[in-house]
Amino acid sequence: MVKIAYIINGLWNPAGMERVFTVRANFLCKYFDITFITRGQGHRPDYFPLEKRIHRIDIDDKIPYFNGLEKCLLENQYDITVSTGGEDFFFLYKIKDNSKKIFEFHFSYDISNVWMRSIMNPIKRKIWAEVQKFRRIYFASHYDQVIVLTKTDWKKWRKWISKVLYIYNPSTIICHETSICEVKSAIAVGRLSYEKGFDYLIDVWERVHQKFPDWQLDIFGEGALRSELQAKIQEKGLANIINIKGVTNDIVKEYQKHSIYLMSSRSEGFPLVLIEASSCGLPIVSFDCPSGPSEIVEHGGNGFLVSPVGNIDAMANRVMQLIADKSLRQKMGRRSLELSQRFKLENIASEWIELYNQLVSS
């Protein structure tokens, strides 16, 4: 059986990348011998459950990472090793263990523009964003295969690297009962960080609340900006209207209890939450940020795409259009469910099976 190792910072975090890799591995372990290699996770348990046949190795973070990972790969002789973009990305390809090396990039091609936001001088910020981007391209060029999450990003990457493919993330949930889109509540899910744009969403809902004061907004997630966002909600007098709920263990139930899904991100790789919301029959209003929403949301079909990112009034108007028209919400919700079938796990998994088998035989 072909042996595959996924190298990831840790599996203790309840985030999108960890969820995606866990779901993928749990499906593919029927066809491949799979190991997750983490670093410094220690006694923290994996957040998402893994099938028993999947192996786990945690490298002590007190030893040099290169040495620990090299020893692990040479001892286990994997056929394929996968970097998910952690520190190992910069040296994994140098380890001579005879495995095929894959680099998966789960962010937008232009994410460096967001990551460099702390540089106040716009010219310096642009320069350093370009430096980081081309540094990433340089290291990625040493891998046997590069995988990105959207067709949009694939077109950008292939200008520099020929061995790049795009494979969508699959739906990671099963929803047996979809939303009826009648509850006066909208939902947003994600890490409470700058790139997710929840500061925008609070401004959007301030406008919505002026016309529809009986509607609520629930935000599910945790992160560094929680106190800052909570303060903004308080400042606008929306403490009883916008609720930051934290992390939930049953996100499907929450989707079912809401009527509209909202996404205010500045940048995304491939937003898993939009697939999840679609699978539960929710209409979507999202900023058309780089690079995933436009490949999930059919504008006017299962929701609305709003441009440019940060256009508060335009997004608020689209939300209010859905709030005012229940039949439109339900029609778009049904279309969401139809479109979500593209991202069923078994369909996406077949692409991974084909890729892994091709790499091993080449």
State each model region's role.
Residues 6-23, 27-64:
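N-terminal strand-loop element at the rim of the active site
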Residues 15-23, 184, 188-210, 224-230:
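A conserved mid-protein helix/loop that constitutes part of the nucleotide-sugar donor-binding site
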Residues 70, 125-145:
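Membrane-proximal helix-turn-helix segments that form the acceptor-binding/catalytic region
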Residues 83-88, 105-108:
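Short His-centered aromatic/hydrophobic patch
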Residues 247, 266:
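Aromatic "clamp/platform" in nucleotide-sugar-dependent glycosyltransferases that forms part
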Residues 283-287:
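Short hydrophobic beta-strand element within catalytic cores of glycosyltransferases
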Residues 314, 321, 328-342, 350-354:
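A short, well-ordered alpha-helix in the C-terminal region of glycosyltransferases
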